């Protein structure tokens, strides 16, 4: 499975952060043994703190909302 999207649940701010990784970011992420280490390199770019988030990575993004 190729990771194209990262979804973060920031429990300190109550935000859901959806990131579509660029081709360059996907390539860079593959050079890390641990995907979480890669995520720490993009914290400042996307303005989140990994220690305050739960995350998942997916190839395809699907959403449902019951609001």
Language-model features and meaning:
Residues 1-4, 36:
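A short, compositionally biased
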Residues 3-12:
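A short beta-strand micro-motif
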Residues 13-44:
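Short, flexible N-terminal segments of the mature chain
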Residues 35-67:
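Short, mixed-charge low-complexity intrinsically disordered segments
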């Amino acid at each position: 499975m190729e990771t194209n999207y990262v979804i973060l649940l920031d429990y300190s701010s109550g935000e859901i952060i959806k990131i579509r990784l660029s081709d360059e970011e996907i390539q860079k992420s593959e050079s890390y043994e641990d995907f979480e280490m890669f995520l720490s390199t993009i914290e400042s770019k996307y303005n989140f703190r990994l220690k305050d988030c739960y995350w998942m990575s997916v190839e395809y993004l699907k959403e449902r909302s019951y609001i």
